[in-house]
Regions:
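Non-catalytic accessory/interaction domains
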Residues: 1-189
Length: 189
């Protein structure tokens, strides 16, 4: 089906609501948009609908994760990851959050491992994995990035990223005071 997308060149500030058919088609095929701008406008409209209680957060989450598979603009990736995090923590029903967080972190881990080496997107995805890791596989990957036993080609694990990885491990219950003290002694900044 076709997607009727108003303000597709983003020439004005407007809150755009899509018709039901355009919304359904756009969300289902968001990763088929050839350009970042129309995809971003569609997702911004969907996000407004989530915030207004007109679209289930789960539908936005699925579309945002699909868009992250194809998005190449760093600023758009950053915004999508922020909305994904907010969606998981504030807009999904409490009963769905645990499962959704684990599934989202799995997707983010896959994307981080496949991201272009050394790019902003790779770094943003690695940070997002650390922030959402909850399963054994996810926390094992974060711990391996931190200790260097697994590397993502091109990812520089500097002191700032080390802290983000460790914070994620602490939040997931995989690290604690001992690891924090060790990192403090390692941090010469």
């Amino acid at each position: 089906g076709d997607v009727l997308l108003l303000n597709d060149d983003d020439l004005t500030y407007a809150k755009v609501r899509l018709d039901a058919s355009s919304l359904a088609t756009g969300l289902e095929h968001v990763d088929a948009f050839a350009q970042s701008l129309p995809r971003s406008i569609l997702l911004a409209s969907a996000w407004d609908m989530v915030r207004d209680g007109r679209l289930p957060a789960s539908r936005f989450l699925a579309a945002a994760l699909a868009a992250l598979r194809v998005e190449t603009r760093s600023s758009v990736v950053q915004g999508l990851l922020a909305r994904v995090s907010t969606c998981l923590s504030r807009f999904l029903p409490q009963t769905d959050r645990e499962t959704a967080i684990a599934a989202t972190a799995d997707t983010l881990l896959t994307l981080a491992r496949a991201a272009d080496a050394g790019g902003d997107t790779q770094l943003q995805l690695a940070r997002a994995v650390a922030a959402h890791a909850v399963t054994e596989n996810q926390t094992a990957a974060v711990a391996a990035w931190l200790d260097g036993s697994e590397t993502l080609d091109g990812l520089v694990v500097d002191q700032d990223l080390r802290w983000e990885l460790l914070i994620g491990l602490v939040a997931a219950g995989r690290a604690g005071e001992t690891e924090i003290a060790a990192e403090e002694s390692r941090d010469l900044t």
